[in-house]
Each structure stands twice: as structure tokens, then as C-alpha cells.
Amino acid sequence: MEERFKKQVYEVAKLIPHGRVTTYGAIAKALGYPNHSRHVGKAMGGCPADVPAHRVISSGGMLAVSGFQERLEAEGLVIKNCRVKDFKKLFWDPIKELND
């Protein structure tokens, strides 16, 4: 995977506000690669500590890593059965946010 792509993924992930979440697919789409959500997931799997990987979840609102539940709950999110409650309300759309 290209280092440039990883850096772009990390830059977008760092913009996700505290208490909000986005998806692998939304980041991929925002970067112009709408079919590369798995590549975003792979990049996030090895991200630096300053990247809030816990705020990037699957398109159905499911946590990809169960260990992220505690970090999201600390930000005020409610997690039930590894799923973010009120996912649609808490969803941060990078395309909308970056174009405003």
C-alpha cells in the first residue's frame, strides 16, 4: 500500500471530532477511492498513536476492534453489542465536512 495513501487516510481520521465516528468507506470515498474501504481498514490497522482509529468503524455502525469500545464510551458514545447507538446521528461525513 502506498505511503501517500496511508498518510491521506491518517489526515482525514485526525479530523474526526471527539464524540463522532465515520466509516472506512466514507474515508475511502472522501479520498477519491470509493471502492477502497478495505485499504483504509488496513491502513488504520497500523496507524500511529496520534490517529484516532477508534472513531473509524464499519458501515453498519459496528466496531471493527472490540477494544475501541472503552475509548468511544469515554467520549460519550453508547455502545451495545459492539454497535454504536445512534450511529447515523453521530456519523461524521468527511466529504460534507471537508467541502464546507
Task: Give residue spans per PLM region.
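Nucleic acid-binding interface residues in structured DNA/RNA-binding domains
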Residues: 1-100
